[in-house]
């Protein structure tokens, strides 16, 4: 990576920009990935280059070109993945993120994947709220295999290193082509910071499948984070 003034460049195996902003805003990846990562709208890392430029305090833009197959498969013959993003900060704490990406197929009969995303959120020292909408056309390079959905989340910081969080996801597929995996999900929980490097987060989850006759699923987790 390299930075100079308002310009930043990254190359090699890098974090992609498709949903990195949303993931950071959500802030609980070790508990549950952000919407696009959770439902495989894209990869969190890939081989390529990215550039970002801050035009003013309230607006910045970024572009990325990567291998398109994620960090587990390195190739160029099957097409590349291109992305453009704009981040707006109209007022302190309130941010808007717009992103569009095109992932080439490189194979006859396969369609390019198009990703469109819009996010807005407000972050305060006491609380965070955010909402995003995502649309993916031609999932897995299959024509008309479109998916879309939204995610809404909020968290509140309490005294003594305790925070509460909640999130609702809703995933759809065009003409119900992927109805077996379409679902709405709710997660509620708390996070306890035990010192500087340890976090423990008990949480309750409810998954509500959209396929007829499939019952909702209820589960409880305790997620742990250890980091330096």
Please annotate each region the language model reported.
Residues 1-68, 78-83, 87-96, 153-156, ...:
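Outer membrane beta-barrel
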Residues 36-42, 70-75, 104-111, 139-143, ...:
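Outer-membrane beta-barrel domain signature
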Residues 4, 13-17, 65-69, 100-106, ...:
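Transmembrane beta-strands of outer-membrane beta-barrel pores
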Residues 88, 192, 216-228:
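Outer-membrane beta-barrel "beta-signal"
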Residues 151-157, 161-201, 205:
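Outer membrane beta-barrel transmembrane domains
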Residues 67-68, 111-112, 126, 192, ...:
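Outer-membrane beta-barrel porins/channels
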Residues 43-47, 78-82, 112-116, 146-150, ...:
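Residues that define the transmembrane beta-barrel architecture of outer-membrane proteins
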Residues 77, 85-175:
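Detector for outer-membrane/organellar transmembrane beta-barrel domains
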């Amino acid at each position: 990576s390299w930075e100079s003034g308002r310009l930043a460049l990254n190359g090699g195996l890098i974090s992609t920009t498709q949903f990195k902003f949303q993931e950071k805003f959500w802030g609980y990846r070790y508990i549950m990935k952000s919407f696009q990562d959770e439902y495989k709208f894209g990869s969190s890392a890939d081989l390529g280059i990215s550039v970002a430029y801050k035009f003013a305090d309230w607006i910045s833009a970024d572009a990325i070109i990567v291998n398109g197959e994620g960090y587990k498969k390195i190739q160029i013959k099957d097409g590349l993945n291109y992305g453009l993003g704009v981040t707006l900060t109209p007022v302190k704490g309130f941010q808007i993120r717009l992103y569009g990406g095109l992932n080439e197929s490189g194979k006859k009969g396969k369609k390019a994947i198009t990703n469109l995303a819009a996010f807005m959120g407000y972050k305060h020292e006491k609380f965070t709220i955010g909402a995003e909408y995502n649309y993916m056309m031609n999932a897995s390079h299959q024509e008309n295999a479109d998916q879309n959905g939204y995610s809404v989340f909020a968290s509140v910081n309490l005294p003594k290193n305790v925070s509460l969080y909640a999130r609702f996801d809703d995933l759809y597929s065009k003409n119900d082509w992927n109805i077996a995996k379409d679902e709405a999900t709710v997660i509620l929980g708390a996070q306890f910071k035990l010192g500087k490097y340890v976090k423990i987060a008990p949480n309750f989850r409810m998954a509500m499948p959209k396929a007829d006759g499939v019952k909702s699923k209820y589960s409880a987790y305790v997620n742990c984070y250890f980091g330096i």
